[in-house]
């Protein structure tokens, strides 16, 4: 193989790293030490939460007999391969068990198998540690979300030592992605498999929706790369280790491209751009990566977010469908990415809404999705790969026991959007958006490197009533409590 050397790869400490050998804990050993949600009157939510952790711990494994993986990891639970984007979302909830098992070290195995030009394959066999794709295949890598995952972890625990280690491979991968996944104008491309959304009908009909780039500008990939610039810049603000002027320039360029080229003013939506310079006019969930990238100008935000409120589009029985319901190929039972509600993309929408201050609708969507997932859990006893958008049932093309990334719903969405508790280590506080009126909270909540908190809100007669909050912490902490347009600061 021919490679162009990438100077950041030379700083990648995971390549050739001595394997970490730890005893893998069992759920039975650790269940009493996990965070314990309180949600009076909703025992089924707690049962679903417990099931998610039990299944997740059952998917932790040591490296198989090979010299390539360097850390214990949580399996993707799909096809015997470790997936880049599945892992990034699995760790969004795995972080809450940090002090019991480091789910985050799953990504170590991807960093350890980085090629010397910066490439990382999106899918690597768990037993042999082999790439499933050649690097110039449009489906070989992506989505590029690992920097978001690492920053999310840092925001919860402030682990600067890990940030120092992961910066180089993340930066190297961004450089590779920019050199190998852009058109001549600096816009980005992928494929159905490369973007992780296999069969969304977004390409011109002569191209294969799974494997072809279709000579198209991909809205999700452009927004993800803009977002990735931002997270790498934030990391460098902490680490002060790099010249990131190229990232600043690229972020500004992608922001301009997204808003001048991929926006349709009439429909107030961001679209993919076909090779004939026509917007494809397919409203799909990939567009909403623009929220997390902070690409949506304030004057466009209300009209854009309105699509998530429209029952003819994305506001269905379940949230959030991957294809707008007014598309002729929308399937009310799912058909994989032609309508199904998926845990990772719905979580992305919630995070993007929250990043833009749209907290009320983030709560509404999160509450709806969690309610449906718990309802289906009650009916089937398991968590599914995806869910039907128009019915409280599994998607018609979905796998059971998918924990896997579906664990993000009864854990992270439950904690962060329904219970409303979000960690902000960089601000040295927790923000608690109190939307519920029943007694609720979390016991044994991990925050930062040393904090363990018990957080309890007593029952209220209405959403306007001031929450009565009890906080117990082993270290001093600030809790910003927000409710009904008001807020108060608690120091414990």
Residue map of PLM features:
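Acidic/polar, glycine-enriched structural segments that form the non-catalytic walls/loops
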Residues: 1-80, 160-165, 171-178, 234-243, ...
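Aromatic-rich carbohydrate-recognition surfaces in CAZymes
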Residues: 10-11, 80-193, 219-222, 226, ...
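Structural helix-adjacent loops and short alpha-helical linkers that scaffold large soluble proteins
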Residues: 36-46, 94-107, 153-171, 234-252, ...
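Alpha-helical scaffold segments in soluble metabolic enzymes
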Residues: 176, 231-234, 303, 413
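Non-catalytic C-terminal accessory modules of carbohydrate-active enzymes
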Residues: 307-314, 335, 351-492
């Amino acid at each position: 193989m021919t490679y162009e050397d990438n100077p950041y790869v030379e700083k990648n400490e995971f390549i050739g790293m001595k394997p970490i050998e730890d005893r893998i804990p069992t759920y039975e050993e650790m269940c009493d030490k996990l965070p314990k949600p309180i949600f009076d009157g909703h025992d089924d939510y707690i049962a679903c939460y417990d099931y998610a952790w039990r299944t997740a711990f059952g998917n932790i494994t040591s490296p198989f007999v090979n010299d390539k993986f360097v850390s214990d990891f949580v399996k993707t639970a799909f096809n015997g391969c470790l997936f880049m984007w599945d892992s990034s979302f699995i760790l969004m909830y795995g972080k809450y068990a940090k002090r019991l098992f480091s789910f985050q070290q799953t990504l170590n195995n991807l960093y350890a198998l980085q090629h010397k030009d910066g490439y990382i394959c999106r899918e690597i066999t768990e037993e042999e540690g082999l790439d499933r794709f050649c690097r110039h295949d449009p489906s070989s890598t992506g989505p590029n979300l690992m920097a978001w995952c690492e920053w999310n972890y840092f925001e919860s625990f402030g682990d600067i030592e890990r940030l120092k280690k992961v910066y180089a491979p993340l930066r190297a991968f961004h450089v590779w992605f920019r050199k190998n996944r852009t058109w001549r104008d600096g816009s980005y491309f992928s494929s159905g498999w490369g973007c992780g959304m296999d069969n969304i009908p977004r390409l011109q009909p002569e191209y294969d929706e799974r494997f072809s780039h279709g000579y198209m500008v991909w809205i999700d990939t452009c927004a993800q790369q803009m977002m990735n610039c931002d997270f790498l810049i934030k990391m460098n603000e902490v680490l002060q280790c790099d010249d990131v002027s190229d990232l600043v320039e690229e972020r500004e360029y992608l922001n301009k491209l997204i808003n001048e080229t991929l926006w349709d003013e009439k429909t107030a939506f961001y679209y993919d751009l076909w090779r004939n310079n026509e917007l494809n006019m397919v409203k799909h969930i990939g567009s909403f990566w623009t929220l997390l990238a902070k690409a949506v100008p304030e004057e466009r935000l209300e009209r854009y977010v309105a699509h998530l409120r429209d029952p003819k589009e994305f506001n269905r029985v379940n949230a959030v469908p991957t294809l707008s319901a007014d598309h002729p190929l929308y399937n009310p039972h799912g058909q994989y990415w032609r309508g199904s509600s998926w845990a990772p993309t719905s979580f992305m929408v919630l995070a993007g809404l929250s990043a833009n201050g749209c907290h009320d609708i983030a709560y509404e969507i999160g509450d709806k999705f969690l309610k449906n997932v718990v309802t289906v859990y009650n009916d089937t006893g398991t968590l599914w790969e995806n869910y039907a958008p128009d019915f409280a049932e599994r998607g018609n093309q979905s796998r059971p026991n998918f924990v896997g990334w579906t664990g993000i719903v009864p854990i992270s969405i439950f904690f962060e959007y329904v219970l409303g508790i979000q960690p902000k280590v960089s601000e040295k506080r927790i923000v608690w958006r109190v939307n519920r009126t029943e007694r609720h909270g979390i016991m044994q909540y991990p925050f930062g490197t040393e904090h363990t908190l018990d957080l309890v809100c007593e029952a209220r007669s209405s959403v306007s009533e001031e929450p009565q909050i009890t906080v117990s912490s082993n270290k001093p902490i600030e809790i910003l409590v927000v409710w009904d347009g008001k807020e108060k600061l608690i120091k414990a």
